[in-house]
Amino acid sequence: MLKVWEPQAFLEFLNRRRTEFYPEIEAQVRAILERVRREGDGALYAFTRQFDGADLEATGLRVTEAEYREAEAAVSAAFRAALQVAVENIAAFHRPQVPTSWFTTRPDGTIVGQRVTPVDRAGVYVPGGSAPLFSCLLMTAIPAVVAGVPEVIVCTPPDRNGRIDPHMLVAARAAGVKDVYKVGGAQAIGAMAYGTATVPRVDKIAGPGNYYVTLAKKLVFGPVGIDMLAGPTEVMAVDDGSVDAEWLAADLLSQAEHPNGMVILVTTAGPERIAAVGAAMARHTAALPRAETIRRSVAELGAALAVDTLEEAADLVNAVGPEHLEVGVADPWAFLPLVRHAGSIFLGRWTPEAMGDYIAGPSNVIPTEGTARYASPVCVETFIKRSAVTCYSEAAFRAQAPHAVRLALTEDLLAHAASMQIRLAKPDGESPSEGREAG
């Protein structure tokens, strides 16, 4: 079921795929964003009719309290219990990430430091489609709440009846979300970036989406911050034959059931192992309701690569920079130091990637398409910023300002130099008010 690649040929294929441009899609996204910027809610209603088949003008874009109450009554006690475990684990993982402001005084009396503050309002995008991805909501909104963001909102597309899945709404309340808006696609990104009469403008947008959503995030960046450019999902499994082939096959299929999901197997156990895992994938697929999506994903983006050593496997991992990395080897902790580029790493046979999707604690909103080379999963840091703080005493200023003046003059920035020279011209200990009176 998996296409066998020669490693270098696969890396070349991957690089071509990751560097493709889609100017026709960019033109469509730009047009959507511009219409949202100009027309606000009117554009959102029109696009929701066009793309989601829902007419919301009578009921509005914002989820009402009545809808939250209906959702609470609709979900099972078992779901509530599982949700609570997930919420607790996600919050517990992210709390230690919260940084503190700090200040230090140098020997000359200068005080320097950093003041850490959250953004005022965060916008979370949750994809729609055939499944209610409330896990993405939890994994994005909870880090924002833990970071201290005063207001977190969510945009997600409605169904054809103009409703949001009740599990999504219950998850939103459990995560601490203020409001949910029935808006999806690139138009949702535009609404959160520019603001409309209903959807407030946010300071940071986070969450995954399809190519249209990802491109919209890229285009609005600047006036609003974004977490990353997170595209279709990926999983890469490093294997030495020590994990049951049936288990490994099931793990790979867990990502293939997403449209355009990429699955990569790197094994040191030879062609027979690839055949065994592929056969197991075929058997599992036949019994799954999303079999058609899985077969398409695997046919287009499934790959198996045979290597001789785990060191070679690690080189491939670092070249790919996968979103999800499963390390199914006899000693996963010995392999871990070899990994430099991977979004989220799952060690050992009892750690299927799907545990990370729902309940382990780290966010499942993770860099894709090789961006793990420089980017990180959504976390508390996504929603905070640092302000540098500096305070000179007079003595410290007089000691160091001449050096700063020399540097400013060397850059030929005379006004910079003058702002320091005007202070140096004052007699020691004379306040500005004393100087004015003397003049």
Curated annotation (Swiss-Prot):
InterPro entries with a match to the protein in the record: Ald_DH/histidinol_DH, Histidinol_DH_CS, Histidinol_DH_monofunct, Hstdl_DH
Required cofactor(s): Zn(2+)
Statement: the UniProt record of this protein carries the keyword Amino-acid biosynthesis: yes
One GO cellular component term noted in the UniProt record for this chain: cytosol
Keyword Zinc among UniProt keywords: yes
Pathway(s) annotated for this protein in UniProt: Amino-acid biosynthesis; L-histidine biosynthesis; L-histidine from 5-phospho-alpha-D-ribose 1-diphosphate: step 9/9
Annotated residues for binding of NAD(+): 125, 187, 210
Keywords (A to Z) from UniProt: Amino-acid biosynthesis, Histidine biosynthesis, Metal-binding, NAD, Oxidoreductase, Zinc
Coiled-coil spans in chain: none
HAMAP family associated with the record: HisD (MF_01024)
Family statement: Belongs to the histidinol dehydrogenase family.
Protein name in the entry: Histidinol dehydrogenase
Organism: Symbiobacterium thermophilum (strain DSM 24528 / JCM 14929 / IAM 14863 / T)
